[in-house]
């Protein structure tokens, strides 16, 4: 049994619920939202396609009391970034939302592992830790998991290779102050600095990487997606589900 509660059924929360269902790592998923009808609709929509994924997961909308016994609770609630807006500009509003949710959810799921996905994620994770009184090892921010995935995607595009062969990481705070420790970055064990000589396309020579350009690209990726489609939710949802998989 692996019960997961998701608070917030906007684009990110709903996509996490759907993805968890397809991954088959949850036996029960509870959706909680201030907009009860939205939560009911998302649960129904996912549930009605469940037969294509084994049909073993119980998915339903509920209230905080329904989170009792959850192994994992994922917080996605809060306002989302608008085009041109920074994550830090969301801080006070989303801090207030997190503080209002915190006592209600921890009352019923005091032993759960909490994954904070809402932005600004590092600030909200710290607030949740300080306000909840829960052990530090029960609270996880999604942090730079998404940034790392974006970096690997960019490097895989650059060298035309599978993303799973890229072993590079983004450290620090999620967003503009993050950084890449290039000295440990490698592709299938080959240090990244040696890759231009070793990874080539017939008739072409790969130019040396511009580390600063790559880091800037990664930092601006979220804003680039928001400018084009209004919100980011697929990649961040995949990052949240990856954390759940690691805990499974």
Where are these regions (language model features)?
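Conserved N-terminal Rossmann-fold NAD(P) cofactor-binding segment
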Residues: 32-71, 85
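N-terminal Rossmann-fold NAD(P) dinucleotide-binding loop
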Residues: 13-14
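Rossmann-like NAD(P)(H) cofactor-binding subdomain of soluble oxidoreductases
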Residues: 86-152
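C-terminal substrate-binding/catalytic lobe of Rossmann-fold NAD(P)-dependent dehydrogenases
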Residues: 132-138, 148-248
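Extreme N-terminal starter segment of soluble prokaryotic enzymes
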Residues: 1-4
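Glycine-rich Rossmann-fold phosphate-binding loop(s) that bind the pyrophosphate
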Residues: 9-10
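Conserved NAD(P)H cofactor-binding loop of Rossmann-fold oxidoreductase domains
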Residues: 77-79
């Amino acid at each position: 049994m692996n019960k997961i509660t998701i608070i917030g059924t906007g684009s990110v929360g709903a996509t996490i619920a759907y993805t968890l269902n397809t991954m088959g790592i949850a036996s029960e998923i509870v959706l909680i939202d201030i907009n009860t009808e939205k939560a009911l609709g998302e649960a129904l929509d996912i549930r009605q396609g469940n037969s294509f994924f084994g049909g073993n997961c119980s998915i339903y909308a509920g209230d905080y009391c329904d989170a009792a016994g959850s192994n994992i609770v994922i917080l996605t609630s809060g306002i989302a970034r608008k085009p041109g807006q920074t994550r830090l500009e969301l801080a006070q509003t989303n801090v207030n939302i997190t503080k209002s949710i915190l006592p209600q959810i921890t009352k019923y799921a005091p032993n759960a592992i909490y994954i904070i996905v809402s932005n600004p994620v590092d600030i909200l994770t710290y607030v949740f830790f300080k306000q909840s009184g829960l052990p530090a090892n029960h609270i996880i921010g999604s942090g730079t998991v998404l940034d790392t995935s974006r970096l690997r995607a960019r490097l895989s595009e650059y060298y035309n290779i599978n993303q799973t062969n890229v072993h590079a990481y983004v450290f620090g705070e999620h967003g503009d102050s993050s950084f890449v420790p290039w000295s440990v970055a490698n592709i299938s064990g080959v240090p990244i600095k040696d890759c231009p000589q070793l990874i080539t396309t017939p008739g072409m020579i790969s130019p040396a990487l511009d580390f600063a350009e790559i880091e800037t690209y990664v930092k601006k990726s979220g804003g680039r997606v928001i400018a084009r489609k209004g919100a980011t939710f697929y990649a961040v949802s995949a990052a949240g589900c990856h954390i759940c998989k690691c805990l499974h």
